[in-house]
Swiss-Prot record:
Taxonomy of the source species: Bacteria, Pseudomonadati, Thermodesulfobacteriota, Desulfuromonadia, Geobacterales
GO biological process: queuosine biosynthetic process; tRNA wobble guanine modification
Cellular component GO terms held in the UniProt record: cytoplasm
Gene responsible for this protein: queA
Species assigned in the record: Trichlorobacter lovleyi (strain ATCC BAA-1151 / DSM 17278 / SZ) (Geobacter lovleyi)
GO molecular function: S-adenosylmethionine:tRNA ribosyltransferase-isomerase activity
Catalytic activity: 7-aminomethyl-7-carbaguanosine(34) in tRNA + S-adenosyl-L-methionine = epoxyqueuosine(34) in tRNA + adenine + L-methionine + 2 H(+)
Alphabetized UniProt keyword annotations: Cytoplasm, Queuosine biosynthesis, S-adenosyl-L-methionine, Transferase
Family: Belongs to the QueA family.
E.C. numbers: 2.4.99.17
Record pathway: tRNA modification; tRNA-queuosine biosynthesis
Subunit field text: Monomer.
Compartments (UniProt record): Cytoplasm
Protein name stated in the entry: S-adenosylmethionine:tRNA ribosyltransferase-isomerase
Length: 341
């Protein structure tokens, strides 16, 4: 199976660089795998496609303002991109500056905080220790910039602090948003629950790997990135109960989908716990837990498009993407959504 089979042409003007005026004001394409039917509705009408006893599984990760700007001892400007915490006051970071960094270097940041370059882990990958902040997370919220995707081709703005975050985000740690969840408002979630649909949560801290291109020719040769996850026992129990009642397990986003599938055994039984998920789902994979999938429209040749193709069927999904382009759907993180049932 070749990566180029997942290519498609997307006009630049269909990349959504800003969110819709209202979270649930985006469009929703509904794909029925049984009938091969395709429908188009407003996202706020998603309730019509959900049934009592369904279970909606949300990823409650919270995007951190991971971009920091500082000054080296020489006066040069440097950017730090926080990737993941490593022990006490240390983070794995990507460093970008005009000149090479060195171990032991000190970087001046906002509000008197400094960053010490401890160790080089990769070409731009460094271990950084922060000094001078008693409450690092609060400091980061004040001075950091939101890590919006590079394909938006703009700097982050104040609106991104709110809109590049789901309304139910609670567990800090992601450097990219679980974008399928961006469409929900609190009011819409309440309407969903009033219909007898339950909500459950998982946490998967979306990492930088979500933006990394696939650089091999054959899909099966790609090595997927690892991401930290947590599956609560309450969610595992809710999935079991939903199945027993004949309801559907609906994953809100590829991250919730990957978490559920990674934590399941071959019989579909979930193991509650936490760890690092590195499951790569592409056509040929047999889904063990997820019955329906809500997702955004993804990049050509991306692992996310491969996952969606595995769930909906490659030809069906690619034809839906062609229709989405023709119908002027908005693509990527701030774009429209697709529900596959």
């Amino acid at each position: 199976m070749l990566v180029k089979e997942y290519s498609f042409t997307l006009p630049d003007e269909l990349i959504a660089r800003y969110p819709a005026n209202q979270r649930d004001g985006s469009r929703l394409m509904v794909l029925d795998r049984q009938t091969a039917a395709r429908s188009e509705i407003a996202f706020s009408q998603i309730v019509e496609w959900l049934r009592p006893d369904d279970l909606l599984v949300l990823n409650d990760t919270k995007v951190i303002p991971a971009r920091l700007f500082g000054q080296k001892e020489t006066g040069g400007r440097i950017e730090l991109f926080l990737v993941e915490p490593v022990g006490d006051a240390c983070w794995r970071c990507l460093l970008r500056s005009s000149k090479r960094c060195r171990t032991g270097q000190s970087i001046r940041l906002a509000e008197g905080v400094t960053a010490e370059v401890v160790e080089q882990l990769g070409e731009q990958d460094w271990l950084i220790r922060f000094h001078g902040s008693d409450d690092f997370e609060s400091w980061l919220q004040r001075v950091g910039q939101m890590p919006i995707p590079p394909y938006l081709n703009r700097e982050s703005e104040e609106l991104d602090r709110v809109r590049y975050q789901t309304v139910y985000a609670s567990e800090s740690g992601a450097v990219a948003a679980p974008t399928a969840g961006l469409h929900f408002t609190q009011e819409l979630l309440e309407r969903i629950q009033e219909k007898g649909i339950r909500l459950a949560r998982v946490t998967l801290h979306v990492g930088l790997g979500t933006f990394q291109p696939v650089r091999v020719e054959r899909v099966q040769d790609h090595v997927i990135h690892r991401e930290r996850y947590r599956l609560p026992s309450e969610t595992a129990a809710a999935v079991t109960e939903t199945r027993a009642r004949g309801g559907r397990v609906i994953a809100v986003g590829t991250t919730a989908c990957r978490t559920l599938e990674y934590a399941a055994d071959n019989a579909g039984h979930l193991q509650a716990g936490q760890g690092e998920a590195d499951i790569f789902i592409y056509p040929g994979y047999r889904f063990k837990v997820v019955d329906a999938l809500l997702t955004n429209f993804h990049l050509p040749e991306s692992t996310l498009l491969m996952l969606v193709s595995a769930f909906g069927g490659k030809e069906f999904i690619l034809s839906a993407y062609e229709a989405a382009v023709n119908r002027q759907f908005r693509f990527y993180s701030y774009g429209d959504a697709m529900l596959i049932v």
